[in-house]
Each structure stands twice: as structure tokens, then as C-alpha cells.
Regions:
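Feature captures hydrophobic
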Residues: 1-265
Length: 265
């Protein structure tokens, strides 16, 4: 049986990291062009035991991506699937260990190469260690990816019953936590928490003012925190990081962000 850490890590990759492929295929011009007019079904799966598997699948219709957690059970054939023999093997692959290659089930080689182009682009983007210089477009894309990854990752850990995260969520009234870059509403993500339940969302939370918002003055400042190259206290003093809400909640959310990051590294 897989360890709790293995299960948590796999869920973050399956339900928080791999769904970023939709954003990358949509926001990176050369990839968006590659999928113009394309219809395809893709899947990534990992065996849990002899009968069960974890999976995420992607349905591309005329170039537009949708992401679905779980196995594809439709009538069409999957064009390409990366099928891992275990969650451990998938986790190693996602962390860059090329010794844990999946079984590749390919119906259409052309569509497979397009899918791999997006997966490789995601890998290269999430491997960037320093904020890009003089490239705001790339910096904003990276912020969006990390905001989506972290909000979804924390929510998924809660849903799995991670002791630290779920205990916090159980005690929480109806609250919304948000990540944002000032002046760029398209680069925003949130997580709503209430009595043990949670839901991550993309874009600004519209129903009410967020209970807490971790806002950055620009994408570069955000990346300094997200990539661990900036000093949080100094940046807060310089108003590069603005915590809209009680600072103790910022520390709490920061701990869960680091938890997601540690599992995914």
C-alpha cells in the first residue's frame, strides 16, 4: 500500500499540476497555434492497485481544452495516454527522474507529439529558478501557474484528509483566500474554505471581498516569494507584498503553500 506522502504527492501532480497543461496550451501562442482545429483525448494514469487507478484526462475540441479528474469512460478512443505502473513511478517521473518512464499508449502519433510538447513546456516553466528579467508576459504566466497550483494543491490536500490542512479547514467558517498581482486580474486564484470543505477557483472571487488576499505589486515580486528568492519580511515592509487581512492568516497560508511545494519537489 502506498504511503500517505506518496498519495498526497500524487494527488498534487494529478489534480493540481497536470491541469496546468490547459492553461499552458491556451496561453503560450506557439502551443495554441499547434492545437488549432485539433480534436483529441489524452490521459495520464497511475495504478493504485491491481484494480484501481488515479487518472486525469483532457478533452480537446477544436483546439479548446477541458480537464476532467478521473478515468476517461467515453466511447471515443484515447489518442495518447501516459500509463504509470504505480503512483510512486509517476511521482518520480514528475519530479524529473527519467528512469521511471510510463507505458505510452498511442493511437495518433501526431496528437501524442502535440501533447508531449505541452507537457515538456510545463516542465521547463516550473523548473525556472529565478524570476525572468525583462519579460513581464512570462512572469505573469508563471505567477498564474503557481497560483493555480497552490490553491488547487491546498484544497486537494484538505479533501484527502491531510491532518494539518484538514484540521484547519474543519475549524474554518466560510472564508475565501486569494492570491493576486496588482493590476492583473487575469493572474488571480482563490480558495474557499468552510467547515472542512474547500474549493479552488481561477480568477477573482466575485461573491464577496476575500477574507484574506496575498497581493503582490508586480509579477517579479510574486515570483521572488513563490520561488523562494525574496525575503518576505523585507518585501512586506517595502509593500511589494501586501497582506490584505490579518498577517497571522498570511503565515498560515504560507505554511500550506510550502507544504504543497515540498511535496511536489
Amino acid at each position: 500500500m502506498a504511503s500517505d506522502e506518496t498519495r498526497y504527492t500524487n494527488k498534487i501532480f494529478m489534480a493540481a499540476a497536470l491541469p496546468l497543461m490547459k492553461t499552458i496550451a491556451t496561453d503560450v501562442p506557439e502551443l495554441k497555434k499547434k492545437f488549432e482545429g485539433v480534436n483529441a483525448i489524452y490521459q495520464v494514469s497511475a495504478k493504485v492497485n491491481a484494480e484501481d487507478k488515479e487518472a486525469v484526462h483532457f478533452i480537446v475540441e477544436n483546439g479548446e481544452w477541458s480537464v476532467k479528474l478521473g478515468e476517461y469512460l467515453g466511447q471515443e478512443k484515447i489518442d495518447a495516454e501516459l500509463a504509470f505502473s504505480s503512483m510512486e513511478k509517476m511521482n518520480e517521473f514528475m519530479k524529473g527522474k527519467m528512469t521511471s518512464l510510463p507505458k505510452m499508449k498511442i493511437k495518433s502519433f501526431g496528437k501524442f507529439t502535440k501533447f508531449m510538447a505541452v507537457l515538456l513546456k510545463m516542465s521547463s516553466l516550473l523548473s525556472i529558478a529565478e524570476p525572468p528579467e525583462n519579460d513581464e508576459e512570462l512572469s505573469l504566466l508563471l505567477c498564474k501557474l503557481y497560483f493555480y497550483l497552490l490553491s488547487s494543491g491546498i484544497s486537494q490536500l484538505n479533501k484527502m484528509g491531510h491532518p494539518q490542512v484538514h484540521d484547519w479547514a474543519l475549524k474554518s467558517p466560510d472564508r475565501c483566500y486569494q492570491w493576486a498581482v496588482d493590476g492583473h486580474p487575469e493572474c488571480t486564484a482563490y480558495m474557499r474554505v468552510k467547515a472542512g470543505k474547500s474549493r479552488a477557483g481561477r480568477g477573482e472571487y466575485k461573491r464577496s471581498k476575500p477574507f484574506f488576499c496575498m497581493k503582490f505589486d508586480c509579477a517579479t515580486s510574486a515570483l521572488k516569494i513563490l520561488l523562494g528568492t525574496g525575503d518576505m519580511f523585507q518585501m512586506t515592509a517595502n509593500k511589494q507584498l501586501i497582506m490584505e487581512g490579518a498577517p497571522e492568516f498570511g503565515v498560515q497560508i504560507g505554511d500550506y503553500m510550502m507544504l504543497v511545494g515540498s511535496l511536489a519537489k
